[in-house]
């Protein structure tokens, strides 16, 4: 470990790894404090969906920019990252949801994002295991999936950052204090510890949001695209109630990853049988044949949620302390963009997209 670094990052998940890689590429010396597995925590628990989302113009800008960065790197990604350009289909159960498909398509196309509205017949042809009678859907063909833990490890390896295998006890401008009594000194310290970031930076508006997931044995071709019910958007927007929504994702291994659930105010990471059953029942409502598949593992994780559904990226009131947290369910998608925004601001360069919507000092209003 050096006496001092240009940048010290707390957190070795995919966001911290992307920040390390981008800062190193900008010529900065980097250290990363992470006591656990690289790409553990929410990175290991997440679905790995790289997706453009349009809840707000700022969310659309960030996810579109970051998805483009993933596409640019497609040829570089090692096989273990399991990059799968399968596309997303937002599934509409009725005419009201079809109207939302058409709205989302118009927004996407206006921003240069490929999107195609599917009628019921086209949806059934694209995904024959969905239940009959669904109204249609919206295909976003350039979305993809990755295996996040391996992606995080790849990014950190590329960064050549010094790995400090100790937990951060506190973070201050230009300094990470370690639980073993040591410290990492740097020009800028970055808090990239996800759902645990308020423990290091008290007062920031980040809350834990628990989720359950399940994965099946190998059934190649059973699901061809990432499938998400449009009701997912309602559950994702709820800031108080527990919710579930159908989300099925193909893996390059042939497995099917199933979600999703959302819970606030739960600190215990244990699997809750009732919530898991509720989630799987919802999935079977959309894909009845899932009942015949064998689930081989279930787990939980904690998303880092903010009131306005946008991450905290950039300098705090003290420019020697940065935040890179609050990505909720979009940390995998937006990790590369987060790294680029952090590196550009540290170096005093112009950012590729406006940084203001994500700055930690913004006024947040719940969406």
Describe the function of each predicted region:
Residues 3-5, 179-188:
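Core beta-strand elements of the Rossmann-like FAD/NAD(P) dinucleotide-binding domain
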Residues 6-31:
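N-terminal Rossmann-like FAD-binding beta1-loop-alpha1 element of flavoenzymes
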Residues 15, 38, 196:
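Conserved Rossmann-like nucleotide-cofactor binding loop
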Residues 21-22, 50, 81-83, 195-317:
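Active-site substrate-recognition segment that forms the wall
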Residues 25-44:
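Glycine-rich FAD pyrophosphate-binding loop
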Residues 278, 284-367:
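C-terminal catalytic lobe of FAD-dependent flavoproteins
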